[in-house]
Amino acid sequence: MLHGKSSIKSEGLTNALLYAFFIVLIYALLSTPFHLIDSINPEILNTISTNIWLNIFFFLIFLFFAFSFFGYYELTLPWSWANRLDFASNKTGGIIGIFLIALTLAIVSFSCTGPILGSLLAGSLSSTEGATQLSMGMTGFGLALALPFGLFALFPNLLKNLPKSGGWMNTLKVVLGFVELALAIKFLSNADLVAHWGILKREVFIGLWILIFVGMIAYLFGLFRFPHEAKKPTLGIGRIFLAVVSLLFVMYLVPGTLPNSSSNSLKLLAGFPPPTFYSIYTQDSDCPLNFDCYKDYDKGVAIAKSVNKPILLDFTGWACVNCRKVEENVWSDPEIYKLINEELVLISLYVDDREPLAKEDQFTLEYTSGRIRNIETIGQKWAAFQAINFNSVAQPHYIMMMHDGTLLAPPQQYTDIPTYLQWLKNGLSNVPSHSIRFKFE
């Protein structure tokens, strides 16, 4: 008898662990197609993430998700899917049955997880990590979902001690709705930057975020409620805490709307708002930190040759978050700023610029693999230039070189201040003896 109970308990433990494992596996597998796409054409995810109309689509999707969180409607997959899987799991049994139960959970919980997964997908496509970040995010999400279900399968008595869902769950969903609104603005901003519409300048973007989080503060303090909420919620510790954090965040944002706000460049948010030079206020330069930069390779090389200075070649993007982080958090370091400003010619090539090339400058490019690509925009030209000459499609990507193409240091990507500074010094110390020499004492 004891042996029988032990065997049943052991089987229950195994099934619970398998259940949790399959939940994680299902969400991880959802990212697999994006790795296949990326392996076929390594530039495809960057092309997708910076596509103007796709970013507008993501903007609309995030608005749709936000209003779902606000309770105006609920996102659900057809119940027939869940019912069929549930029937199949009961009929099949064993490992396959447990997998089908996990798949049933993924479908049934879609009304809560769908908007979050959509946000994760869109956010990952917009990052330089692409499919890898998506896989990590989906796996992490699956793990977070599987952990409590696995624990409850192991220890059913824990369910009795859980607080009942209700007010706190609704508050959390509404807060996520406001966050979705803020992220929606980010995708609209990507489209605006790439297309050069000039609609969402930096201060307008920050102003919209301020309005969104002020709205969230008002909701948390109970100044208004959404139609699906029957009664005014209780102002508990959780609501007060979230409201205070949101208020501090709004206070942090406000200086970013003012002219000459370099004293508060919102470094914690670097990469999310548009670049500082994309402003409603008059700027001395259309380059980061008011550098003198050149956005055409040939022109920049000619200038470097005429002034006898080495080149800092900057492969960047209008919608590149890590590019903004380097510009605002690394280049702003006084020592790095001085070296770039005084000792180098900065050439910034935007690989996601959708401005069409002049008809006579458009051409067809054939890769060594035999793949043929029509180069019709400025961004396509610089993306192909980077891929062919430097075997990379990631941004930011920095090259130190002489005007004749001599490389002064290995390429550098997204990194911290000490590493970037040392890289600059190493590159400048390798300038040929017949050219300029530098000292860093």
Task: Label each region the model flagged.
Residues 351, 438-440:
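Long cytosolic C-terminal regulatory regions of eukaryotic multi-pass membrane proteins
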Residues 306-324:
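Short active-site neighborhood of thiol/selenol oxidoreductases, capturing the structured segment around
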Residues 297-301, 331-412, 417-430:
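Thioredoxin-like thiol-disulfide oxidoreductase module
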Residues 143, 177, 315, 320, ...:
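Hydrophobic, well-ordered secondary-structure elements that form the walls
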Residues 165, 169-172, 201-204, 329-333, ...:
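Amphipathic alpha-helical segments in well-structured domains
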Residues 324-327, 403:
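Detector for the c-type heme attachment site
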Residues 113, 321-324, 399:
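Cys/His/Pro-rich metal-binding microdomains
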Residues 1-300, 307, 349:
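Hydrophobic alpha-helical segments characteristic of multipass inner/organellar membrane proteins
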